[in-house]
Structure formats: C-alpha cells, structure tokens
Amino acid sequence: QRALTRYYLDAGAGGLAVGVHTTQFAIREAGLFAPVLELAMRSATDWARERPIMIAGLAGRTAQTVQEAQIARDLGYHAGLLSLAALKGAHEDELIAHAQAVAREIPLVGFYLQPAVGGLLLPVPFWRRFAEIENVIAIKIAPFNRYRTLDVVRGVVEAGAADRITLYTGNDDHIVLDLLTPFPAGANGGKTVVRIKGGLLGHWSVWVKRAVELLERIHASVASGAIPANLLALDAQVTDCNAAIFDVANDFHGVIAGCHEILRRQGLLAGTWCLDPQETLGPGQKEEIDRVCAAYPHLNDDAFVRANLERWLS
C-alpha cells in the first residue's frame, strides 16, 4: 500500500480513493478498514510535496457507513465515496435519508455503481434530491451506460448544483469521451454546458503516469476548443485495454485481479491475490492483458515504474 501510494503521487495523481475497487471492499470483513486508511493517509502525508485529495470508500447500511465516515474524517480524509450497494431494494426516501446521515459526518462523493457489479438503478429524481444535499461535493458517474450517465447530469442541473458539485467519470468503458463531452445544462438549446472534470476510476489504478498525461491533454483540448481525431481514437484504445483489465468477457469476474496483474508485472505487487479467494483472473484474461499490452505500448508507464520502483519499495 505504501509503495502504491508513492507511485500514484509521483505519477501526478491529484488524489487517492482508498477502500474501493483494488483496495477491496473485503477489507471490512477482515478488520482492515481503519488500518488500510490510516496507512494510506500516513504514506501520502509523508511522501507528497502537496497534500493530495484523500477520499475514503464508504459502504454498508447506515450505522456501518456512518461509523466508517467518522473513522475517515478523524484520519483526515477530505470526503467519503458513498456506495449504496448494501441498500438494494430500499425506497428512494430511505436512500436519501441514508445519504443525509452520512453527509452530517463528512463531505460526500456520490457513486453511481453499475448494476452488473452490485449497483442500484438510480433515476433522475434520486440524483436531483441527492444533489440538493448541501455537503455533497462531487459525484462519481459509473453506471457504464450512456442514458444513466445523462440521468446524473440532469439531476445535478435540475437541483441547481452544477457549480457546487464536481462530476467525475467512473465509466471505465468511456473515459476519454466522458471527459471531452459538453453535456447539456438545461433547455436553452444546449448553449450552457456541464462537463465531467476528472476521473475516479479503477482503470486509473494502473498506468497512472499515462492517465495523468491523458487528462492534461484532454483539458488542454477542451480549453482550446479543438478536439483532434487522434485524441478521439484514444477512447476506443483505452476501452479495449479496460475490457482486458476488467475481464469484461467473463462479466467482470477478474475486475480486481486484472488491475493487480498489471501492478504485479510492473513489480509493484508480489502477486494478484485478493482477500476473497474467489477473486481471481478470469479464463483467458491473462492472454487478453498480453494482447492489449502489445497493441498499445504508448498507454503503459512501465519505463516510469522501472526507473522509480526501488525507491517506492524502500
């Protein structure tokens, strides 16, 4: 964890999200939630020249999530990324009350998790009400679905919260175009737009140096008003890589182990093991990762990692 934190910060990441995806939700069952968050915070504080944004993953029913929010707040985390997966089947009023309770403890980053991996279907009215919660500062949009992505944007706009809430893409299948798209902000013929400003992505737990460079390039292109064709082409290339790393062919079975495999190949992890022994690479996933590594060498940061690995592991 210490070496990964150092890698992410030296690669230029603006912040770290701890307790989600590759950190594994299972740390909670293993009694590792607080120790992992504490180690990541201490590592980031000791290593970074400028303090990064630190976000803690929050999960479970209300009592557990509130407790996790208190732990994260006391450790100095800036915000909590709120998973609603444990509230499947709950009424919208219950979901909003849950979010309000957690928001009283720590600033919130909303999280639209794709249903394929346990997320709930959350319509526009939910996102409008969620965006009205004053201590919501951002939303990670990750339904892996164009229509549902628009639902989040529309809900934030209808709540009048577009200037207060920062939107992040979590759509690992559509990273580049999410960041390039001017989303409509109302019924004025699309003259006013809302933009997704950054990424909070499992895919960006690997090849981080290249991800940072890509984000900077996208921001520069948006500012200039000129989007080159080769930048648009990167969307499909990044998505192809993500299909391998997230094990889409096996319905995301190896979604964590695939990220671990990239980090293992670079020497940042000793293996691909997960706390849940069922979390392994899927059938054929290793070969798919081989394929995309060979097809898109410009998307990896292997040379950067090689040059710094010994220092990070010290």
Question: Over which residues does each language-model region extend?
Answer:
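Active-site beta->alpha loop and helix N-cap motifs at the rims of alpha/beta catalytic domains
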Residues: Q1-W127, Q278, D302-L313
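Residue-level recognition of short, well-ordered coil/turn positions
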Residues: A13, Y77, N135, A161, ...
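Generic alpha-helical structural context detector
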Residues: R42, E213, H260-R264
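Catalytic alpha/beta core domains of metabolic enzymes, predominantly
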Residues: A101-R104, Q114-V255
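C-terminal extensions of enzymes
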Residues: N242-S314
